[in-house]
Amino acid sequence: MSVAIKFTVKINDGSLRRQQTRHVFLSPAALNRLKLSPSQVIYLKHKGGEAVGITQSVKGNGIGPFEILISPLLAKWANLKAFQRVNISQYVHPLKEAEGIKIVASLSSNNEPIPESLIRKELLEIRYLHPGMIVMGESPMNMAKSGSKNLSSENMATEIFEINSGLSAQSGTEVGSSQSSPSVNESEPKATEDLDELSPGSYKVKEIHIRSPSNLIEAISDMSLDEPRIYKFTAASSMEIETPDLLKLPHEDRTQSAYNQGSEETQNFDGPPSAVTFSSIGGLQAQIAQIRDIVELPFQNPELFKFFNIMPPRGVLLYGPPGTGKTMVMRAVAAEANAQVFTIDGPSVVGKYLGETESRLRKIFEDARAHQPSIIFIDEIDALAPKRTEDVSEAESRAVATLLTLLDGMANAGKVVVIAATNRPNSIDEALRRPGRLEKEIEIGIPDKSARLDIIKLLLSGVPNEINDAQLEDLASRTHAYVGADLAAVVREAALRAIKRTISLQKDTSGLDIFGAVQMDDLEFALSSVRQSAMREFMMESPNVHWSDIGGQEEVKQKLKESVEWPLTHGETFSRLGVRPPKGVLLYGPPGCSKTITAKAIATETGLNFIAVKGPELFDKFVGESERAVRQVFQKARQASPSVIFFDEIDALTANRGEDNSSDRVVAALLNELDGIEALRNVLVLAATNRPDMIDPALMRPGRLDRLLYVGPPNFEARKQIVKIQAEKMKFAEDVDLDLIAEKTEGCSGAEVVALCQEAGLIAMHEDLEAKEICQAHFKTALLALRKAITRDMLEYYASFSESVTSIS
């Protein structure tokens, strides 16, 4: 397991003392070769060679047992198997209280000491099973920065003075050489180090240091040490300088900003982790190509820009819903360009004193210039640089002005680029979005089917699974509006379910090692529990209503299938014939005739993203808020396309213009969204009303709500089917005559027929709470109390309206 340990670079000028903890002391030659600078924060990551660790709680006055790696010769002498785990006995020698306890351990087997000479010659490694905090070694090692030339073992001793709490360079070339670096005074007392912040336990380590084989292990520790960690490196080992981002230990904050508020130093990042590459990002190939042109071309070919006398772009704005991969794209670009990343997030850079925020911003930009190539990443820039209005404070206005000045000063910044991210691009001050500042804008939107398929394949590639290509295609087609983070959550939930199933199987099979895999059922379960983050604001609960739950209305069902399903399932036919799919459908008819339940069935049967909006919900007492709410609904629908927007009781939202100013503005906003400049693609508007005459006629012309479907009272067959559907849900006696009930309910709406069945059930319960079924007599009684809400005048009104409009069907 790789170990990443944080250090700060210091110059070896001969005056530094070993009391300075967690520093890497380098000669000027080493600094130049590794392209490092003093005070730069780096991570050292073990790369190759032998270095593992174990954890063992302190019991009494000793540490143990350890796991050791021994040679076959030593194993044969000790009657052990090679690489077998054995114990190390402890000999405790009390020293001065200030120095803690000195523990000198020797190897034993079956309580019989092994000759020290053999141990010196054949002991290969002392291992821990826990990723540790400290690395120390006696032999030369290679040290390199990603993308630069290694420092070989020959020049290591002369160029690296020491890595305190890390690597102690030796001039010898053999493991176990007792010759120390001439810069280290062995008689000098060992440095005291506080490693609380680096370790999960609460303890202090004065020093843990592997010295020469004559002592094998020498540890100076106080007795509060709960998890000692010892590392030994061989000549085959090497250290690599890595970025801190995502290489921190599990208990450390992974979202550390570039500016540390508690310190005057800026945290310099030596490029993002190598794990984040373009190959680890799915579905964003077009956006990655755009940002690579902006970042990599100027970094790799600055002379060409100078030759053509053009200024490369200095700022990029990535915008899109949360979880779409904006930050991941930035990290991948930085890794590929081998650039350091300086992260600014709004809350961490804002200071409470006058001028503190501006000073911090200037400091970060200065440090980025000093460590080129570099990327300044401003996350959630809308919080740091909102639009300057009367409501914005003076401090926020100053921060925006400072940011504008710094961006203007990027003209001669060299290999430095600013990348900003937000999910609210229209909330950013307009001055930031002009050429010369954040001049390039790239949308990281909700992925389409093809992008979702790439993301799902990528996520499942590292998970044992039994999902075939056809199932992957089906999964991608049913995850509309799922962003990358949502899909990752789906795979994670599915994997957790597979883990639980595996544990259960292991228990049932007497502890046999059974390892399962993610199956399609696991993904189906995960889909039902993970909602689309982009649609949570508008998403209604899954209606779970099917066409079979609606009696009759076959013509309406067919028209809706043509309007909603056909453009998705037969898109090529529409294109071949030059037919434009309808943009909107208006369902009108008497109350209770299944208009709303039909819309719910559309959502269930098609699996499209379904945004339900009730007319009164969009009205706001403040001018402009209602129109903004309309725009937000359509914006979400576009992002989550293919989708359906359902306006229930639309007559309350779009009354005839001229009667109410607020209604006029809402109608204008709707008209603009339906056939404005921005195309409405893969979004169907479905509306329902029982007062079609109240709707502004402009909404019902072709190209807007261009399909008007009358949903009238059910006929005889439809009423019979409704009663039959209720009979499947309720307990009807054999004497119940479905034909008679359908005949007696002529002129009733579907809702009234359902209410009749419910009333008959209540009558049966009233007669006998122990009743087993509902009889015909109960229906006869219920029919006596039946009230019909649909009048002849109402039917004539709808017939007259149908004649007055032109329906495209």
Swiss-Prot record:
Keywords of this entry: ATP-binding, Chaperone, Cytoplasm, Hydrolase, Nucleotide-binding, Repeat
Gene encoding the protein: afg2
Molecular function via GO: ATP binding; ATP hydrolysis activity
Identification of the protein by name: ATPase family gene 2 protein
Annotated binding of ATP 1, by residue: 320-327
EC number: 3.6.4.10
Transmembrane segments: none
Entry GO terms, CC: cytoplasm; cytosol
Catalytic activity as recorded in UniProt: ATP + H2O = ADP + phosphate + H(+)
Ranges of compositional bias, category Low complexity: 170-186
Pfam families reported for this sequence: AAA, AAA_lid_3
InterPro entries for the chain: AAA+_ATPase, AAA_ATPase_domain, AAA_lid_3, ATPase_AAA_core, ATPase_AAA_CS, P-loop_NTPase
Any GO BP annotation: ribosomal large subunit biogenesis
Binding site for ATP 2: 589-596
Region described as Disordered: 169-199
SMART domains listed in its UniProt record: AAA (SM00382)
Disulfide bridge partners, by residue number: none
Domain notes: The first ATP-binding region binds ATP with low affinity whereas the second ATP-binding region binds ATP with high affinity.
The protein's assembly and partners: Homohexamer; ATP binding induces oligomerization. Forms a ring-shaped particle of about 12 nm diameter, that displays 6-fold radial symmetry. Associates with cytoplasmic pre-60S ribosomal particles.
Subcellular location(s) per record: Cytoplasm
Sequence similarity: Belongs to the AAA ATPase family. AFG2 subfamily.
Function: ATP-dependent chaperone which uses the energy provided by ATP hydrolysis to generate mechanical force to disassemble protein complexes. Plays an essential role in the cytoplasmic maturation steps of pre-60S ribosomal particles by promoting the release of shuttling protein rlp24 from the pre-ribosomal particles. This step facilitates the subsequent release of other shuttling proteins such as nog1 and allows the transition of the pre-ribosomal particles to later maturation forms that bind SPCC550.15c/REI1.
Signal sequence coordinates: none
